[in-house]
Amino acid sequence: YMVNSGFGENIMEWHKKHPDIPLHFFWDKWEEEPVKKVDDTLTFYQLDDVEFLRQMAGCKAYASTAGFESICEAMYLGKPIMMVPAHIEQDCNAYDASLSGAGIVSNDFELERLLEFAETYEPRREFVYWVRRGEYLLLDLLQKNAAGYSQTLFNEMYLVEEFI
């Protein structure tokens, strides 16, 4: 998924050197048709959340500008990731994901590096287990803090009433 239109040109150049490797990218070039099939192995899609997840589920590796949601989706699906951040929030996402072993960070879509990384990548299933437990972790945290919070809230309300 790319938000910088210049990245599309980089992908086209890379594809010319590696025409046998299938590439599916999503971009926000609204002036283009919804699906731009350059040839049998290069396709650009307009942003489409359903198609995006369908393509990601079947991909060998994922290259992105490091948006939070798509990085989490790739981690959940166990995909090796190359992150090419375009601004500070994405820099933070890329840094955090690389620390967790989810992928590599680059200044450009150097897809050779991603393919090399993908060969030895081992998904960390702990992330999936953590996500699946998220609801229970949150409920547990809320229950542990509910009694103390309620008491504090009522005390503050009582104090407010005294001043009225």
Language-model regions, residue ranges each:
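CheY-like receiver
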Residues: W14, Q55, L114-F117, L141
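Anion (oxyanion) recognition and catalysis
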Residues: K16-P19, M75, S98
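A donor-sugar binding/catalytic signature common to diverse glycosyltransferases
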Residues: R54-N93
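C-terminal amphipathic helix plus adjacent low-complexity
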Residues: E116-I164
